């Protein structure tokens, strides 16, 4: 489940054993043939956890900027990602039925927002509300991912009416049957209500719309941006903002030499069951308990995953098996196998399946080049939190401020050409020094956590939940400042066993993200 708030996290992972507990690598090779996929793929060789020396995918990728862009789009699991994106959601309104069309040949727009997800709709609505002439461009697709959220965060956004179910308690299981209570209410968001609310804001603010894919953004001699669409329409605008998801490398430039992107994958099902051990009054944030009951660990058990469970009633639940983060994408079929094995071990018998979900979230990777003239927002702007895998709350909360900066830029430059220095003001709003320090900290942790097996991750959480409550709750809620995160790390260091301290020091010295984190923190 893609979560609007913070569901799972990857700041640091440690082992309490005498040596680091590293993940074993088992190659899982699948061959697929894609002939009718719009991305121009011919064939893909996928490795679910193969050796680092093997290529993760070999394909013709006409619509991707490079290998990294392809991985962000779905990589070896792209068929499942497409299945998720193209689900039928008849209850959600079509944008083309609610928004007026962009008027072709009727002068330049102030702003074009490319992408129709939560980030794109929110930014378009907020910008138009400030008096800008805003056009929204992108495929007319519904919201298909299930969303979970800390209730107070959505209340702060004025979106409490979009929550369809609330659990007053949220719990975590590690390696026994005694749960850790989070002490914070958690909600399930209605995809339909969220889509309708953001669309309503676009309608009321006067956003126009074109259902099309964008091929390129170029600059005209007069300084206008020319947004070329695949239907041969070219939309002129004073400024273009890309909000079309993480795989936006053909429209944006990213910093060279940054960390390799990792991926969080999850397979979920909403089902009717005969019986369930989960309390309908409690949302299960993470369940890392052993579910195999086998003395000899199987292939599936070597991949660290946890169960995420939303019990709407005693018999209707949403289950999701999640791989926190991995350098090599964990395949959905393996996640499904693990989920079914887990449910079987728990004695849960499925009577009816209402929906399947394939959640694919790129985490980490490089920041956009903040010198470029085109802007970005949401996942395209690397706003996905490396420690949680989510970006929607940040996108929705920062849309008003970002729109205000864009409006101010355009007001100041009414008779001037938009240039990189002006665009830099908007980039600095998204990525001020404080945000960069936080991100550097989380990237360091992400590089650490992908090394560990299930027991190593459990070891981390046993230490994590010994921290002061404000610390681990603040981490889960993404409210800790960069200074707080330093205190977080120091406290973890103090209460951890000696082997953990040694391991953290070695990782800080040997991994490039350690040097980057220190350098970023030392910048004035």
From Swiss-Prot:
Mode of membrane association: Multi-pass membrane protein
EC number: 5.5.1.18
Keywords: Carotenoid biosynthesis, Chloroplast, Isomerase, Membrane, NAD, Plastid, Transit peptide, Transmembrane, Transmembrane helix
Transit peptide: 1-45
GO biological process: one example: xanthophyll biosynthetic process
Subcellular location: Plastid, Chloroplast membrane
Catalytic activity annotation: a carotenoid psi-end group = a carotenoid epsilon-end group
One Pfam family this sequence matches: Lycopene_cycl
Keyword NAD annotated: yes
Transmembrane segments: 441-461, 475-495
Cellular component aspect of the GO annotation: chloroplast membrane
Gene Ontology MF annotations: lycopene epsilon cyclase activity; oxidoreductase activity, acting on paired donors, with incorporation or reduction of molecular oxygen
Cross-referenced PANTHER family: LYCOPENE EPSILON CYCLASE, CHLOROPLASTIC (PTHR39757:SF3), PTHR39757
Biological role stated in the UniProt entry: Involved in carotenoid biosynthesis. Catalyzes the single epsilon-cyclization reaction which converts lycopene to delta-carotene and neurosporene to alpha-zeacarotene. Required for lutein biosynthesis.
Protein name as it appears in the record: Lycopene epsilon cyclase, chloroplastic
Organism for this UniProt entry: Arabidopsis thaliana
């Amino acid at each position: 489940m893609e979560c609007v708030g913070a569901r799972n996290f990857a700041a640091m992972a440690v082992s309490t054993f005498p040596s680091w507990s590293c993940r074993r690598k088992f190659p899982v090779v699948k061959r697929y043939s894609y002939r009718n996929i719009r991305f121009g793929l011919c064939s893909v060789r996928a490795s679910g956890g193969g050796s680092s020396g093997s290529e993760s995918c070999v394909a013709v990728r006409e619509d991707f900027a490079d290998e990294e862009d392809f991985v962000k789009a779905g990589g070896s699991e792209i068929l499942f990602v497409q299945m998720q994106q193209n689900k039928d959601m008849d209850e959600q309104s079509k944008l083309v039925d609610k928004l007026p069309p962009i008027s072709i040949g009727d002068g330049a727009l102030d702003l074009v927002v490319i992408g129709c997800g939560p980030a794109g709709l929110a930014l378009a609505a907020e910008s138009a509300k400030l008096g800008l002439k805003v056009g929204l461009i992108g495929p007319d697709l519904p919201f298909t991912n299930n969303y979970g959220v800390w209730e107070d965060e959505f209340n702060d956004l004025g979106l409490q009416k979009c929550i369809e179910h609330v659990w007053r308690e949220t719990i975590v299981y590690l390696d026994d049957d005694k749960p850790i209570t989070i002490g914070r209410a958690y909600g399930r968001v209605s995809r339909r209500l969220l889509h309708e609310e953001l669309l309503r804001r676009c309608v009321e603010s006067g956003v126009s719309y074109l259902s099309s894919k964008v091929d390129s953004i170029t600059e005209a001699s007069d300084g206008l941006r020319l947004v070329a669409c695949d239907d041969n329409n070219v939309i002129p605008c004073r400024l273009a903002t890309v909000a079309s998801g993480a795989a936006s490398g053909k429209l944006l430039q990213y910093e060279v030499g940054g960390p390799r992107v990792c991926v969080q994958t999850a397979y979920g099902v909403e089902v009717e069951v005969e019986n369930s051990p989960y309390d309908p009054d409690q949302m299960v944030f993470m369940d890392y308990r052993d579910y195999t009951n086998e003395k000899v660990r199987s292939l599936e058990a070597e991949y660290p995953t946890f169960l995420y469970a939303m019990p709407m009633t005693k018999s209707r639940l949403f289950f999701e098996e999640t791989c926190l983060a991995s350098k090599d994408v964990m395949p959905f079929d393996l996640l499904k196998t693990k989920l079914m094995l887990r449910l079987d071990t728990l004695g849960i018998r499925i009577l009816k399946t209402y929906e399947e979900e394939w959640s694919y979230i790129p985490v980490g990777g490089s920041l956009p080049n903040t010198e470029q003239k085109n802007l970005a927002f949401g996942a395209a702007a690397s706003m996905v939190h490396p420690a949680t895998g989510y970006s929607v709350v940040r996108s929705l909360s920062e849309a008003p401020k970002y729109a205000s900066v864009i409006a101010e830029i355009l007001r100041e430059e009414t008779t001037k050409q938009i240039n990189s220095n002006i665009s830099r003001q908007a980039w600095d709003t998204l990525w001020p020094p404080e945000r960069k320090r936080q991100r550097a900290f989380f990237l360091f942790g992400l590089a650490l956590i992908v090394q560990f097996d299930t027991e190593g991750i459990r070891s981390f959480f046993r230490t994590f939940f010994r921290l002061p409550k404000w610390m681990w709750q603040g981490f889960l809620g993404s409210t800790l400042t960069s200074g707080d995160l330093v205190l977080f790390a120091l406290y973890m260091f103090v209460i951890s066993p000696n082997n953990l301290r040694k391991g953290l020091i070695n990782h800080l010295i040997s991994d490039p993200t350690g040097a980057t984190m220190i350098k970023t923190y030392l910048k004035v």
